[in-house]
Regions:
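Signature of N-terminal electron-transfer/Fe-S-associated modules in redox systems
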Residues: 2-208
């Protein structure tokens, strides 16, 4: 009787579905350092014993670092857990879908959760801490426009906005929106982000 019930249960059971994240994280290949994205390492995957840690040298906020990294560490792991740059956040569990881990790497915005640390040897990196230490106008503009509510997403927005203003000193609202398209604000303060960036742009142009 029990065996018959088990057979019926097995027939009626629906197969489980593995959630595959949508967007660039699922399908991306290549190096995040060069503007593309790469699938994040599978958590818990055993690394073959033939793969050994390597020494990586990088410059972060103007300071040189040399450290041993495991082959499955992401750049975010290194920046946040090893070097203490806590502005590098984790909102989307490493799927490259939120922008909260954004940094500037070799002059371009990059998702640090999508970059393998071992591939970042020789990289020049700037985090939100470096932008704040340099007293960039974006910092004051974000404060004066009450842009942050929870503040969790703010570092990623600031990093992305800095790169935008370096390449476009007078961006339109649509250009700002396009630049920030990969950054999520869970408090919904998008209009304030735009105002802050516009104000910082005016300061950088000497108009404020």
């Amino acid at each position: 009787m029990l065996a018959e019930k088990q057979k019926k249960a097995a027939k009626s059971a629906k197969p489980s579905k593995t959630r595959i994240p949508e967007g660039t994280a699922a399908a991306g290949i290549g190096s995040a350092r060069h503007g593309a994205t790469a699938a994040p390492p599978v958590r818990g995957t055993r690394i073959p014993s033939t793969i050994i840690p390597r020494t990586v040298r990088m410059t972060v906020n103007g300071r040189p670092y040399s450290l041993h990294v495991e082959p499955n560490w992401t750049l975010r792991d290194v920046l946040r857990q090893k070097l203490g740059f806590t502005s590098v956040k984790d909102f989307c569990n490493g799927y490259g879908a939120c922008g909260s881990c954004a940094v500037i790497m070799d002059g371009r915005p990059a998702l640090s959760c999508m970059a393998i640390a071992a591939d970042c040897d020789g990289a020049v990196i700037e985090t939100a801490e470096g932008i704040a230490d340099a007293k960039h106008p974006l910092i004051e503009a974000y404060i004066m426009n009450w842009t942050a509510q929870c503040g969790y997403c703010t570092p990623g927005f600031v990093v992305t906005a800095k790169v935008l203003l370096e390449h476009n000193p007078n961006p339109s609202v649509d250009e700002i929106k396009e630049s920030l398209a990969g950054n999520l604000c869970r408090c919904g303060s998008y209009p304030a982000h735009i105002k802050a960036i516009q104000e910082a742009a005016r300061v950088l142009r000497g108009e404020a």
